[in-house]
Curated annotation (Swiss-Prot):
Membrane topology label: Multi-pass membrane protein
Cofactor(s) needed for function: Mg(2+)
The organism of origin for this protein: Bacteroides fragilis (strain ATCC 25285 / DSM 2151 / CCUG 4856 / JCM 11019 / LMG 10263 / NCTC 9343 / Onslow / VPI 2553 / EN-2)
Biological classification of the source: Bacteria, Pseudomonadati, Bacteroidota, Bacteroidia, Bacteroidales
A Gene Ontology term for the protein's cellular component: plasma membrane
Gene that this polypeptide is encoded by: mraY
InterPro entries reported for this sequence: Glycosyl_transferase_4 (IPR000715), PNAcMuramoyl-5peptid_Trfase (IPR003524), PNAcMuramoyl-5peptid_Trfase_CS (IPR018480)
Entry EC no(s): 2.7.8.13
GO biological process, one term: cell wall organization
Subcellular location: Cell inner membrane
Identification of the protein by name: Phospho-N-acetylmuramoyl-pentapeptide-transferase
Cited Pfam families: Glycos_transf_4 (PF00953)
Record key words, sorted: Cell cycle, Cell division, Cell inner membrane, Cell membrane, Cell shape, Cell wall biogenesis/degradation, Magnesium, Membrane, Metal-binding, Peptidoglycan synthesis, Transferase, Transmembrane, Transmembrane helix
Length: 422
């Protein structure tokens, strides 16, 4: 909104109004404003949650031996993150930009889904929350909206990066002069760092391009569902999900910035995406909101984000990566989320396989994997064998959290470095 006001003032030659035309200025303002909202207003909101007794519900110590220490801590703090993202974006962003619109829809959509889940848990006293099938329907619905919008909108285009052999030892990357609708995505180790989904369904002949878009929509649905659930599982320790997501957000912000700048895109040999500079505004608000929230969520947590926050930040990361055509980098960048997801799936599969044989067995002491590192064998169900019992030493949750942050930083660096590998 302020962008349009200052654009009008700039036409009237109002001093300083031209600053809002610079993406870097608006991005800096977005991160500062989001940080202030989440830290200052967040404190007031936490006190409101306490007064209304919107707190973590009692947990069964046999099921969750760590949760009993968290009872009474305010939950649904994800509202702080959502508000701290939306206000800067609405004030500083170009609200006609298709990418900004999609990110705002994602934030509100998954925020509402997570809010419904938390509401049922806290106010209806139902520990299961929103039924799993409704969560999946919500995530699939969002993936469908995002995928079809990127397919149908004429504003969603790229300029393809092309490698040109200038000499025997020198390759120059140039970009086409025409905007294209494309099913290409960025992936290391492929020619020009690009993979075209249409090539994967080349056997469809003249229908390959349409089939490529259908495949893209399916992958979009899968990525949105997987990453939002991964972030949800990662939110099991104080500061864990917020810290990891801020690091991932910073990396995506860098990728969005270079994708919106034709020279930087050429340096990294990735496609140029016109209009994606508005995503930098959004991701800066995202980072600022998470850092401000982390002020209260770091150990010992004064507030939990709940599913209101974790589903939202996971979905934001997924949709953002899809928009900038970097969704196939998610297994590297969001490696922590991937491992958390896999640990839960493998634990269930291994347990059920043993149950069919009449054996009590688990792959890890506890899942998701971050709980494995703080669980002693005494907390495992009596008579249950555990495949992986190491490490013998138990770690405090703050140490586990920081180490997971470090792993995410390393994965973020690898994500960017791989793009320079020819």
């Amino acid at each position: 909104m302020l962008y349009y006001l200052f654009e009008w003032l700039h036409k009237l030659n109002f001093p300083g109004a031209g600053m809002f035309g610079y993406t870097s200025f608006r991005a800096l303002m977005a991160i500062i404003l989001a940080l202030l909202i989440s830290s200052i207003w967040g404190d007031k909101f936490i006190n409101l949650l306490k007064r209304k007794q919107i707190t973590e519900t009692q947990r069964d110590a046999k099921i969750d031996p760590f949760g009993v220490n968290k009872v009474g801590v305010p939950s649904m703090g994800g509202v702080i993150i959502i508000v701290a993202i939306l206000i800067p974006c609405l004030l500083l962003g170009k609200l006609h930009n298709i990418y900004m619109i999609l990110m705002l829809i994602t934030t509100v959509w998954l925020g509402s889904l997570g809010f419904a889940d938390d509401y049922i848990k806290i106010f209806k006293k139902d520990k299961e929350g929103l039924h799993g099938k409704f969560k999946i329907i919500g995530q699939v619905g969002l993936g469908l909206i995002v995928g079809l919008t990127l397919y149908l909108s004429p504003d969603v285009v790229i300029r393809e990066n092309i490698e040109v052999q200038k000499s025997e030892n020198e390759i120059e990357v140039i970009h086409g002069t025409h905007d294209l609708k494309s099913t290409q995505t960025t992936i290391p180790f492929f020619k020009s760092n690009n993979l075209d989904y249409a090539d994967l369904v080349g056997f469809m002949g003249e229908h390959a391009q349409t089939a490529g878009w259908i495949l893209f929509v399916i992958i979009t649905i899968f990525v949105v569902t997987a990453v939002s659930n991964g972030a949800n599982l990662n939110d099991g320790m104080d500061g864990m999900a917020a810290g990891n997501s801020a690091i991932i957000g910073l990396t995506l912000g860098i990728l969005a910035y270079v994708s919106s700048h034709i020279e930087f895109a050429g340096y990294l040999n990735i496609m140029y995406i016109p209009g994606s500079e508005e995503l930098v505004i959004f991701i800066c608000a995202f980072i600022g909101a998470l850092i401000g929230f982390l002020w209260y969520n770091a150990y010992p947590a004064q507030v939990f984000m709940g599913d209101t926050g974790s589903l939202t930040i996971g979905g934001i990361i997924a949709v953002f990566a899809i928009i900038i055509h970097k969704e196939l980098l998610i297994p590297i960048l969001c490696g922590i989320f991937l491992v958390e997801n896999l640990s839960v799936l493998l634990q269930r599969f291994y347990y059920k396989a043993g149950k069919r044989k009449g054996i009590k067995q688990r792959l890890f002491k506890r899942a998701p994997i971050h709980d494995h590192f703080r669980t002693s064998m005494s907390l495992v169900e009596p008579g249950c064998s555990v495949k992986f019992t190491k490490p013998d030493q138990l770690f405090h949750e703050s140490k586990i959290t920081v180490r997971f942050w470090i792993v995410t930083i390393v994965l973020a660096a690898i994500t960017i470095i791989t793009l320079k590998i020819r």
